[in-house]
């Protein structure tokens, strides 16, 4: 229950946070806010539909759009170097722990 709360109950907020950050990055790179937002929303919709409909593991889908020495692998390397994967795991663990606290009346 607590794990499900951490993953899906709070999941939309994590997604919105990532969209917000990617929109800000697009603005930093010179795109107008509306265009940056629309590009990331469309990319997210496409990725979600592909993930749902393909039945493929996310790693396989990511690898399919990652060219050797290309832009995507450069970005993925930066995400890994900055600990984004570990931060997401730690965030979900914190949400799970907080869910447990709230369930026991320690909130």
Where in this protein do the model-derived segments appear?
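NAD(P)-dependent Rossmann-like dehydrogenase/reductase catalytic/cofactor-binding core
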Residues: 41-107
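Short, surface-exposed linear patches
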Residues: 28-30, 88-89
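Active-site-proximal catalytic alpha-helix in oxidoreductases
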Residues: 1-27, 38-52, 70
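All-alpha amphipathic helical-bundle segments outside canonical DNA-binding/catalytic cores
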Residues: 32-38
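Hydrophobic alpha-helical context, especially transmembrane and signal-peptide helices
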Residues: 2-4, 34, 82, 86
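Conserved Rossmann-fold dehydrogenase catalytic segment
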Residues: 1-13, 32, 57-58, 76, ...
């Amino acid at each position: 229950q607590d794990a499900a709360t951490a993953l899906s109950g709070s999941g939309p907020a994590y997604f919105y946070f990532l969209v917000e950050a990617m929109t800000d990055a697009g603005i930093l790179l010179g795109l107008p806010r509306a265009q940056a937002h629309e590009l990331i929303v469309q990319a997210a919709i496409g990725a979600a539909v592909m993930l749902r409909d393909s039945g493929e593991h996310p790693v396989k889908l990511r690898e399919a759009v990652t060219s050797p020495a290309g832009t995507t692998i450069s970005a993925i390397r930066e995400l890994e170097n900055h600990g984004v994967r570990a931060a997401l795991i730690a965030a979900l663990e914190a949400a799970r722990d907080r869910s447990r606290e709230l369930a026991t009346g320690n909130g």
